Every structure is written in C-alpha cells, then in structure tokens.
Amino acid sequence: MKVKILKKKKIAIVSIYDLGNFGNRLQNVAVYKLLKNLNYEPEVIPVDIWSKKKYITRPIKNFFNIFKIQIGSARRLSFLDFNKNIKISKYKLLLKSNKEVVNHSLSDVYDYFIVGSDQVWNPEFAGFGFYFLDFVKDNRKKIAFSASIGVTDISKEFANKMQLNLKKFNAVSVREKQANDLITSLTGRDDITTLVDPTMMIEAEEWNELARKPKQYNGENFILNYFLGEQSEERRKIINDFAKKKGYMVINILDKDDPFYASGPAEFLWLEKNAKLICTDSFHSSVFGILFNTPFLVFDREDTSKNMSSRLDNLLDIFGLKDRKFIGKELTENRLDIDYSKAHERLAFEKKRGVDFLINAIGGVEE
C-alpha cells in the first residue's frame, strides 16, 4: 500500500480550553502535534464558556482578555508559555445571549473540524453545542478524536442530544469502552472506535523535549502527590508516612501553599518523569507515569457524586496495570516495583491505531 499525504488541509481543533489544567493542555498539544506530524495545518479554536447561551465567532484582538488571566500569576504565565507549542486560531467560539446567526462562518475557514480529546462530552461541559460541532456546515467533515464522556451516568435529555448530534459525524473515536458501548447503542452506528488518549500517541522523547525542571527543585528525591479531587487526611498520612520512611519529600503540586504550585505543564512533565512515585487520582498523571516508566499508584476519587473512575479503570485494564490501583491503608516498598515491558508493547500498537484513525478520517491514505 502506498501512503500519500494529500494537499495540506486546514483543521480546526475544538476542545476544552483550560489554562489551569495540566492534562487538558497536554492533550491539546498532543492532538496538535499528531496533526502537524501528518503534514496537516491544525489550529486550536479557543472556547469562551464564561458568557451566556448562544455562541458567535469573531477575531481575537487580545488573547489575554479571553480568559481574564492575571498576568502576575506565575502559574498562569507558565501555562501561557506552554501554549506556544500550538497555533491558536485568530477566531474564538464565544457564547452569546441571543440566537442570531453567527457573524463569521468557521466552515469557510477550515476544511475539517476535530473535537477532542478530553471530556468534551461530559454533561457538565457538553451542554454547549459546539462540543458536538453543531455550528459546522454539512459540507465539512466532523471528526471526534478520542473523545471522553467522563461519567457512566447521563440523563435521558443528554442521551437524546448525543444521539441527534453524533449521527452527523463522519468519524467517531472515543477514549473509553463504556463510551463506545453507549454511543453505539444510542446511534446504531457500528463504526465507533476506541482509542487511547492522544498524549499516549506522542513519543516519550518528544514530551521530554517539552519538559522543564522547576526552579524550586533542590535535588531531593520526591513523591509527586497529584489529586484533582479532595484528598482525605488519612490518604495524606499514608503517603507522608511512606515518604518519611524513604527520606523523600512530597510535592503537592496543586496545593497553593506548595512552592511547586507555580509549575506549568512543562514542569509537570519533568516532575512526572523524575518522581520516585506518583500518587494520583488523575487520568493524565497516570498516563505520563506509563510513558515515562515512573512508578505510580491510582487512588479512587473521594469527592464525586458521579462515577468518574471509568477512564482510569479502562486505562489500567488496557495496559495490564490493574495492580497500580491502591487498596489498603499502608504504602509498602514493593509498590515502587513495576514492569512496563508489556504495557509498552501495547502502547506501540495503540499509537499506530490512533494515527491510522486520523489519516483515514481525514482522507490522507491512497491505495
């Protein structure tokens, strides 16, 4: 089979745009890099979800004003600096209170529209139609790339919304088997593909090039403590007791009182690679543990009313790492031992599947 990349296509990436979330920024960069590596011309369209109701599109004059970023925040500046790794569209999606027709059609600017990755179809975020690409004209391709729902329970109203919109997509891939089963059931489609997160389709060496040692690091061995949900005192004590026993310091990267709170995605990558152990309830923190061969332990999230564990359970299952789930009341030495050989064999296979999906969805393969 002869593979040929066609004339460069201009592609819009629509995803959650959070200048404060490591995983979100890293998946955004991953999708962008994958498309660039395939010789396409991607641009990320920022989404302003802070205004109301209906959206319009308009050129950006001052990128900083969109997100009301406080320039004095070292952490925000670190995130902004990392954003230099992607090309931002001069247009943004902006919610508006009235239902006027959009004043600029993005369908006249881009050839393809890709939504994903991340939890773009989580009911908490996807109430906004742009994550279903409902602003895109029918003569443009709509592609979902490793999209996630993030929860296992959705309302009937939201299920109907998914059913209506996803039937119109030209190609759909999701990040979890549970999402695949749900969408297949809702739409009757038999072509839904389950892929790993795009961050796993980028080589570790390429992530290494983006990593940066935090200025605060003093050379001590450390445990990276990264919890998106609430962390109980009991869990903190388990981790701190083990760190004390080993002579490690604990870096609480999301604690505003921790010096490492100023870290951006580049510093996060370095910490993930160099930690002696990662303790987390985060999907992307676990992903980079696998990519960097760093020992990690997954804790169930304690403070959520909806089931948020499907993504992590699916990840551990695919890569044969179910033993990375922490159960118990004590951390022991053997949790630092991990064999990634089989996981990386599977990783190579999954990377190829992801790239093949993009090429076929966009139309870059010629017999």
Describe the predicted segments one by one.
Residues 1-367:
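Active-site anion-handling motifs in enzyme catalytic cores
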